C-alpha cells in the first residue's frame, strides 16, 4: 500500500495490537470490528442513528493489509492521527462515522450517530494493495 496509515499518535495512548486473525482479506486503513467467532472483519455495521447498531463502536483501524486467516495489526485508542479509507468529498472539521464497508463517511446526524473520527484534511486519492484507486482521509480518531 502506498499510503501511510498511522500518521502520528502524538504520544496518545495508542496501541497496535493483534486482536485476532482476519476473517477474510482486509485492506489497510479500514475501520475494523470483531465477529462472534473472534475474527477481525471490516466494520460492517453502519454506525448511524437510524440503525440498530448506532451505539456499536469499531475496534480501530487496520494498520497493514491482512490475508484471510492471518494475524491483524489494529490501531486502537483515541487521539491518533491516521489516513483511513473513506468516501469522497469529506470536509475538514466534519464528524465521521464508519459505513457498512469499514470506510469513513459523513455523519448525517451527530445527535444519534456514533462518531469515530474528525476529518483533518480533504479527501485524497491513493491505491490499495491491489492497485485499485481508493479514497483516503486524514482523521483524528476520537
Predicted regions span which residues?
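Glycine-anchored, exposed beta-strand/edge motif detector
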Residues: 2-142
